[in-house]
């Protein structure tokens, strides 16, 4: 459905439909809907908060007398329909949308309700906060409410205690200005209170969502009193002046560590495999899997994010799409040869794969350990950090019986493997998860961690943060994933420092 057709169907929704819409919602849905619609209207948020508190104490028979949605339509006579429908999509009220004559699948493709940081009409921070409410367990919500109320008691306390409806507490904090949404693009926003709480309690995914939302939409601060500066966190997850970008640059790093420079950081080679075909050369038939490899939608988001982040660090990024196995090997060898005057080398491969192997675009796989042998065989990379990042499934290939193409790369001493480091999207034997619109969990989390922690933490610690963040994620069907790292670093290695003026591009530009 095109955007024009959606707008046409929205006009068919009448204000007289709203009481029936409200009756079809349960209390939890009504709370979420009220939060999304009224959260950025400070003048009416207090009134709606009181209405919700009354409904929470009332019996179900009193609900037909609720007019929250009708009041909203009166407050926005020209635009209420598009806000309401997007909010209904976000909370997943499919039955209500069907009764309004709308198609859920078409609305889902238009509004992307499953992508927390992307919105069409609803305030971006409200959508992100709702997503967080859905992600937290009841126990996590309860601890959050108690902790924030204890440390930020302002005025009369909210006489409501059911943390299941976390949006009610968020509305209360908005009306007390403990958090601020800023304008429609989050300029002048201040959600640092929540970010600090999430970081301190190891809820890194939730903190990252808020940071990315502000970075994606805000362009400047509305006023000096309500800046939208999001401070990095110190080692304990506490944000303060000493952890600002400027201060982080002067914070002492570990002694006897290898610190890479922006001027000579090196090459970041990105091999992005999205489209696959079966090589027709008879010599390669033995290496082909029995079935065609599918399109890897979403991988361009990973490529773009890696390009942005490593460019920010000073690396010379070289990104290539859809390379066959020999072209992959050629570009890897060329990067090694041109690393004589560089301090490190990064190779990122985004593809399909199986255990210890990644596919070329021609469906011929290379063994990952052989790729590492290539990197370690070049004298001009001896003892230099060599980071291989792999986003690919690593399941055992019991059914396909595909063979990796053999690479000739010889090493003469175990010392050649010093400072070799591999970062895998998943532990051996398991698939790697990738969102078809926003990219993979692993690559996006890796880039987030580098942006946030590279000034203060060495590479091995950054990868540990990534493992924790990804392990805490859950898919729509409760899917899980655990990244894996391994290597032979002989000392701590730090990425080049970045300054506050370095531009960090958000996760999902252009969607």
Swiss-Prot record:
**GO MF, one annotated term:** cysteine-type endopeptidase activity
> Main site of residence?
cytoplasm
What keywords is this UniProt entry annotated with?
Answer: Apoptosis, Cytoplasm, Hydrolase, Immunity, Innate immunity, Protease, Thiol protease, Zymogen
What EC number(s) would the UniProt record show? 3.4.22.61
Active-site feature positions: 352, 393
Propiece span(s): 1-242, 406-415
Taxonomically, which superkingdom?
Eukaryota
Q: Which GO terms describe its biological process?
A: apoptotic process; defense response to Gram-negative bacterium; innate immune response; proteolysis
Provide the protein's localization: Cytoplasm
Q: Which GO terms describe its cellular component?
A: cytoplasm
One Pfam family named in its UniProt record = Dredd_2nd
The positions making up the signal sequence are none
* EC class name: hydrolase
Instruction: Quickly give the catalysed reaction.
Output: Strict requirement for Asp at position P1 and has a preferred cleavage sequence of (Leu/Asp/Val)-Glu-Thr-Asp-|-(Gly/Ser/Ala)
Role played: Effector of the programmed cell death (PCD) activators rpr, grim and W. May play an apoptotic role in the germline as well as soma. Role in immune response, required to resist Gram-negative bacterial infections by regulating DptA. Fadd interacts with Dredd, Fadd promotes cleavage of Dredd and is necessary and sufficient for enhancing Dredd-induced apoptosis.
Q: How does it assemble?
A: Heterotetramer that consists of two anti-parallel arranged heterodimers, each one formed by a 15 kDa (caspase-8 subunit p15) and a 10 kDa (caspase-8 subunit p10) subunit. Interacts with the N-terminus of Fadd.
What is stated as this protein's family in its record?
Belongs to the peptidase C14A family.
Q: This chain belongs to which protein, by name?
A: Caspase-8
According to its UniProt entry, this protein's organism is: Drosophila pseudoobscura pseudoobscura
**Which gene underlies this protein?**
Dredd
